[in-house]
Amino acid sequence: MFAACGGSSGKPDAGVDAKLEGFTDPDIVCPGGPKCMSAGDGVLKVGVAKRAYTPTNFETYTDENGDREWQSDEPFTDLNGNGKFDGVWLFGGARAAISVKTEIEARAMAFVQGDTTAVVLYIDSVGLLLGDLDLIRQHPTLAGVDVDHIIIGSTHAHDTPDTLGLWGPSPTVTGRQKFVLDALYAAAAAAVKEAVETAQPAQLVIATTKLINDESNPQSKTDDFNKDIRDPVIFDPTLTIARFVKASNPNETIGTLVNWANHPEVSHFSDTDSSEITAHYPHWLRDRVEQGVTAAQSKYAATDLAGIGGITVYVNGALGGQIGSLRGTHPPGPGGTPITEVGHVMDEAIGTNAAAKALTALADRGETFTSLPLSLKSATYNARIENTYFHVAFLIDLLGPHPLVGYNPDDPIDEGNYPWLPLRTTYLQVGPLGLVTAPGELHPELWVGGYDGSWSWGWPLLDMTKPNLPDFEAAPKPPYMRDLVLAHDGVKYPILAGMAEDYVGYIVPAYNYKLDPQDPYLVEAEGDHYEEVYSLGPLGEQHTVHPILQLLQYRR
């Protein structure tokens, strides 16, 4: 039926319209576009809302052999009486939820100025495809709600219901469940509607901090929080906290946006906690920013830190290649004792410590802005799928809904007839805050550069004994995405919003892209090359990052 076999030469498909790559002009530019001409009186209004979509009263099973995977001979609760197990499937494959640890939520922040309305919506999910994003944007709840664009992203929380479809009861059966998706769509749309309709005049207090072991020593490493476990070790440990307060009462929070790059996953690898639905550390980070952190809860709280209230929206960052809290990370728990065992306790410590750092930075060096111009630009483009596994997943309807273009579906999928994914990237600026989206797990060097070791934080840049080392001579040259965000007039605080506007897996830079010569996309190449197995293909950087750079350089 198809002949995709990987190991492509990277040559363009024969006969493919060159316009598939990149874009000509953004399709949304505000203010100044046909539906958002004016900035009005220049007053920024901000609204925020949240809704849970946590499954309730769902079917569970008895894990008789203790392998954390459901087998067809294991008993289950057949609540709907249809004779089959309709579980809530989690990341990993055949892993059905048994209980709930934390709520999973959709959280929205709306920005309104003159004719422009933009929303940042982040959902506790591993990832969301374009078809799901469209169903949220077109939800009946939003009929009549005037929004120029909704940026939709996922926190990448692993032990949330499978929204991609990759991790069902067997490799060929989707993990997507209609009752879960319907609840997610409804929750997301309701959060957007409330955020827009409750927007009120706002001011901004904003700060950053580095989540490294000793902020006064850039070489002090980062293993109180996370690590980069793929060479080269390059990542951005910056946490940005943007608190929007009422213009009429600057002591009262409307909502807060927090950005930091880290995989939410540690309890997934626990022998005891991994079958429970949870948002992982983002739940605790959001809660502690709102409610506060005591000195007893975190060594990073020098004194008891009051919460700032409101609703906190967490936006994940450039976490590809692998930025996470595994393999030797030891976040300090209550009393400062390092936590070395993965599980819910570690999730809570990561979120609590990050919140303590955020609240401290805001109190110590928060910068206030009352003039907050709002602008938005967004463009669509396409990226080619060469990954055999993704071909199969789309062909058998394993993955969620997503249009495919640039190929003939009646012919075999092969070099010369690869499908392309329509994608989108968006740049949003709110005063000094500049945010750009990436449609997956962006490798951090594509965000910051850092090939000279300047973004390695005391870790060795490379282990020279590993095979298939990166070719730094072929690495991208500046300016990098972060540089181009900062190049916008007035921007002091750059943010990369990962897993946003779509989800394409890992966005691996071409200079360090290696496939197994015998079984590409099925077996990872020797060395640090797991991420290639879950990427679009060798041209992933060219097709996804270059249009983002193009958008960032666009000026009307």
Model-derived features with residue positions:
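Conserved beta-alpha junction segments in alpha/beta enzyme cores
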Residues: 16-153, 161-311, 315-349, 355, ...
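Bacterial signal peptide processing site
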Residues: 6-9
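C-terminal motif of bacterial Sec signal peptides marking the signal peptidase cleavage site
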Residues: 2-4
